[in-house]
Each structure stands twice: as C-alpha cells, then as structure tokens.
C-alpha cells in the first residue's frame, strides 16, 4: 500500500534471495570439485577461490542492511523486543566480524584470488558472466538487465586493472 514500505520489503527480499543464491552456487562448486572430469573440477575450484571472499562479505553486509530496513518497516518498533528483528540485526552485525572484516576479504580477493594462476579464476568467472549476459540478452524483458550486468562486468575489469596499475592493490 505504501510505496516506500514496498520498496524496503522488495530490497530485503532481493538481498536475502541474492545472498542465498550466491551461497547455493558456492555450495554447488564445492560439490563439483569432487565430481565430474578433471577440467570441471579445476574450473569449480578456481571459481570457488574467487567467489569465497565475496560469499563471505557480500551477504553479511547487505543482509545487515536488510535487517536495518526491517526495523524501519516496523517504524522503529523493530528496534525493541516487540519484534525479533532487533535480535536479527545484532546477530547479523556479528557476521561481518565472524566472516572476517570486509577489508581483509577485499585484500584476499584483490591481492591473491584475482591474480592466482595468472588471473585464471577471474577470467573464468568473467567468461561465465559474459555467456549468461549473452543468453539473457536474447530473452524478452531481460535485455536491459543483461546489458547492465555486462557494463558492470566491464567496470569491474577496469577497476581491477586500475587497482593493480601501481603493482600493489591497496
């Protein structure tokens, strides 16, 4: 009924479902490391190495934002013990600490995982994303989103190159 409440609820849904999808994809990669042919196992290991710091930091940050929105949706009542969202917020805030600080995860990703094996993991991830955007670009209603994702991938590549331009990504 209220547009702003609807926006906050949809954002929470997107954060939670996106985090779950990322975790399930990583779980699938764990399984694929031990099944299939040797090339598929190697690809799964490379992708998992690149995605692990992201899988640790992204959900902890954005699901905390989702919890903050839940408190807002409750009009502040969620910050009291009337609703469990205040406990969820505290628990979620600890996830950012338990999974390692975002700075540590960023250094791991940019300092080690991106350059590992000559950048093979990031190149494989980029090729998978590109293949997905190519397929999605031909599906009615998805082209705009596919183009946005392709542009974001280009920006990621440029940002990664810029970070490494000095030789030390800090």
Feature map (PLM): residue ranges:
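Flavin-dependent oxidoreductase catalytic core characteristic
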Residues: 1-170
């Amino acid at each position: 009924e209220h547009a702003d409440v609807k926006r906050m609820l949809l954002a929470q849904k997107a954060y939670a479902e996106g985090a779950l999808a990322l975790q399930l994809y990583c779980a699938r990669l764990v399984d694929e490391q031990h099944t299939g042919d040797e090339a598929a196992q190697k690809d799964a290991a490379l992708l998992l190495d690149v995605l692990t710091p992201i899988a640790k930091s992204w959900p902890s940050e954005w699901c905390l934002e989702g919890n903050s929105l839940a408190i807002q949706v409750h009009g502040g009542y969620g910050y009291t013990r009337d609703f469990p969202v205040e406990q969820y917020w505290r628990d979620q805030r600890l996830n950012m600490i338990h999974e390692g600080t975002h700075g540590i995860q960023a250094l791991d990703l940019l300092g080690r995982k991106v350059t590992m094996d000559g950048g093979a993991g990031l190149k494989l991830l980029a090729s998978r994303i590109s293949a997905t955007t190519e397929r999605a670009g031909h599906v009615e209603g998805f082209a705009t989103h596919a183009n946005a994702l392709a542009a974001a991938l280009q920006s990621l590549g440029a940002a990664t190159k810029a970070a490494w331009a000095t030789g030390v990504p800090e």
